[in-house]
UniProtKB/Swiss-Prot annotation:
Result after altering residue 634 to R: In MEN2A, pheochromocytoma and MTC; familial form; also found as somatic mutation in a sporadic thyroid carcinoma
Gene: RET
Species annotation: Homo sapiens
Effect caused by changing residue 393 to L: In HSCR1; familial form
Name the UniProt record assigns to this protein: Proto-oncogene tyrosine-protein kinase receptor Ret
Effect noted on mutating residue 1049 to L: In a patient with renal agenesis; uncertain significance; prevents phosphorylation in response to GDNF
Taxon lineage: Eukaryota, Metazoa, Chordata, Craniata, Vertebrata
Biological role: Receptor tyrosine-protein kinase involved in numerous cellular mechanisms including cell proliferation, neuronal navigation, cell migration, and cell differentiation in response to glia cell line-derived growth family factors (GDNF, NRTN, ARTN, PSPN and GDF15). In contrast to most receptor tyrosine kinases, RET requires not only its cognate ligands but also coreceptors, for activation.
Amino acid sequence: MAKATSGAAGLRLLLLLLLPLLGKVALGLYFSRDAYWEKLYVDQAAGTPLLYVHALRDAPEEVPSFRLGQHLYGTYRTRLHENNWICIQEDTGLLYLNRSLDHSSWEKLSVRNRGFPLLTVYLKVFLSPTSLREGECQWPGCARVYFSFFNTSFPACSSLKPRELCFPETRPSFRIRENRPPGTFHQFRLLPVQFLCPNISVAYRLLEGEGLPFRCAPDSLEVSTRWALDREQREKYELVAVCTVHAGAREEVVMVPFPVTVYDEDDSAPTFPAGVDTASAVVEFKRKEDTVVATLRVFDADVVPASGELVRRYTSTLLPGDTWAQQTFRVEHWPNETSVQANGSFVRATVHDYRLVLNRNLSISENRTMQLAVLVNDSDFQGPGAGVLLLHFNVSVLPVSLHLPSTYSLSVSRRARRFAQIGKVCVENCQAFSGINVQYKLHSSGANCSTLGVVTSAEDTSGILFVNDTKALRRPKCAELHYMVVATDQQTSRQAQAQLLVTVEGSYVAEEAGCPLSCAVSKRRLECEECGGLGSPTGRCEWRQGDGKGITRNFSTCSPSTKTCPDGHCDVVETQDINICPQDCLRGSIVGGHEPGEPRGIKAGYGTCNCFPEEEKCFCEPEDIQDPLCDELCRTVIAAAVLFSFIVSVLLSAFCIHCYHKFAHKPPISSAEMTFRRPAQAFPVSYSSSGARRPSLDSMENQVSVDAFKILEDPKWEFPRKNLVLGKTLGEGEFGKVVKATAFHLKGRAGYTTVAVKMLKENASPSELRDLLSEFNVLKQVNHPHVIKLYGACSQDGPLLLIVEYAKYGSLRGFLRESRKVGPGYLGSGGSRNSSSLDHPDERALTMGDLISFAWQISQGMQYLAEMKLVHRDLAARNILVAEGRKMKISDFGLSRDVYEEDSYVKRSQGRIPVKWMAIESLFDHIYTTQSDVWSFGVLLWEIVTLGGNPYPGIPPERLFNLLKTGHRMERPDNCSEEMYRLMLQCWKQEPDKRPVFADISKDLEKMMVKRRDYLDLAASTPSDSLIYDDGLSEEETPLVDCNNAPLPRALPSTWIENKLYGMSDPNWPGESPVPLTRADGTNTGFPRYPNDSVYANWMLSPSAAKLMDTFDS
């Protein structure tokens, strides 16, 4: 008792010694925001006020003083120039133009912005006496002021929208520390507007709730706090700012959110929930190192400190006492954030769990009782009193005794194979043991009948009995087996004993000849149950029939005993020989649909899984349950019938061709004409709303057996065939292909130029030739850096050849997938990364800024096409080409729809359509507009962010129709920002007129582009694909031919990479469909449609086709 009193007094003395160390720490002046935004125009007058920055005080006597950084910064923190244009009033925080920013200065800054458009610049504002370090700018002592840069003059006041007259582009948010003196933290007025538009009156007010600690002064329009804030009472204030604009007789009101967040300081002392400061810790069966024996909880109304501050702020000390206790136990600290309700709102708080943990294994003989004290100190606590608590753990370490039942009685079959498990022995409470090492042994009373073995299971400290010698089982005299079971604790050598009686049952039957050593080899039930294998208790393998539901844990397989194999765990007996249960124990390869086990074996499989242990392979394949439907005679009869039908078909075809050539009119074909023929059976059809077949316009238009086209020469674009050398095929479809080529003296250039040449195949129809001709006519008029460029054509004295720009890196989809292989390791380290990036800029690792730049370039090209009244119809990553310098080029406007991937397109009579990229109105109503291209652009954004991923993963295209109609949209991918995903969802609005136009999309991407510069984790969550466009030919093996397919000697380099076909859309699309179509909802639409609208109606799945597809899938 005296010792306890003395210990308590010592603890109180220690607490008193800690109190003087707990004092208040002044944090100094701080900004109410970490970023400010304003617009900046070229040729704004010197002296124009721009905005105020505000500082809040830590103490009433502090006086703020503001300083500007020396430089202006641009995209990716590029240092552009010394700040010669903007100044600040040191006492008020007013930023103003010191001199006008003219066009020459703007161009100088643009040149230094690494080739990116000069959209935003920023500078740094510092608070004195904070040290003015140009390279560092961290809140609260530094803030950034961003200026949206416009290379135009300030717009006319009458043209400004009310939102532009009232608030900046970016919504402000504020940070205010608790327990600080009240002060001004914002000024509503937009100073440039007030300075340049004095005739417009703007008034502001806050929609304040009753009793809120904020006010807006009506004369100065400054927002300030009324009194010191308390975060523990309320952490967030979601206010609303109201602006009223008076311009003549016009009055308009604009409202925006005005959020204020109260920042925490350590002003709440830790406490015990419900006053509990003592916990009991009983150590008995769980005696392993790292075992948690007791936990006490401490509550703190302050928020969880940052990980770097955690050790410094919260210290936990196991107070000196018994040396054995100091060596045996330790205290672990686990903080977790929680929420508590205060004044009708939720605020964050912290619960700290202090766990008493074993620092080492304890022997079963250890027997002690003690009390441990832990001192918890919130060292940053700034309130009255002390942030110190004392935790108490009452510890009892109990001894463990070993006991076995007096007798075990088991049975075993004479047919049992080696390693067959027949039962378990276990000391009392062994399944609860942890950290106790018990070993089991068997002592046989008869040497000639020693059949069994025992091994200790590490999982539950039991002993598993198994057949170790099958020869003894066959001896008639071994009808009963007698053993002594001995369990020994390895640390203390304490023992327990029991009698084991095993009855041998049945008679021995010899093994079938030709049976495998392992049951797992068998793939069918019949052969499985006819044989035995290692580990079989009955001498015969057992078949486990699966449930047949895809990849499942209950897969079909052959096992020695379904009680133990497979069970997802390779036990200590199964580890003796891989042939016992490879389904649980195999470390080799597994082929087919499966989920691997941890750390080995098969966790789940598809169909039937069988294994070949010697080859270290398992196979999971669909179950083969069907017998042959046709025997040898049946197959002979069918083959004869097929051969006879084929002969008859050949004879009839020859007769028809002879008649056709005999009676058909054959007009002469000159070298300037191209003639194509389409069989009558290939005419497309569409379906009415009732499901009846009807001929399409395209089919009626092509009922003429032969169409002839005269291609007129255009001297401006005609290129001599003799100067064009064709090379390797880059891509081909059913009717067209693209080859790499070299052109001599192209457009007046000296020497050879690498180009791509697009042409038709011999089986092309008049429709494909019309598409190629209209593409030719459109490309003559199109000229944009982000649209594939036309160089010329060969239209005379041979087939039509289009010569277009060559893209070095192929399709964007392939480029993105290749970038996955770069990974973080490609970035190198230190200076080597920067050197590599400078020497090979196109090979450096992708950043999020690069991906946004790709999307911005494509949006620029699509904006241009929209202004040209062109609709793409197939905007996707596979149809974007990547040229030198990572320049995006829009291509493939429709001709190459026959060559796409199976999972991207749905096959119809007219080819394949890109279901997963099509807008909802295109799928259901066959409407194709610029706004349907916006939908496709949203899917393209998803492809870019996922580095070439397949949209709607796991969803077949045929099932996508109803999912889209019911509002299904793809989820936000990893590495995708909220603002990028928000842009995707806007592109996928169901109503086309609610989607953004490409001009607005470009602006949104410009804003994102200047914010992001972080590297992507290309190794995370991305599959490793093989090279997509590799056909095995080297550069030297690429054949060269001229336009007449005559071989040429190789005199030029032939480096190439495969691409999809290039193409453009029809420039003469009518505004309305030539065939009136009725929407399902009965409304008429004003969107322009694709000219062959009735043809594309045939792309939709009919109800019967959809039902057939579902049946096939199932």
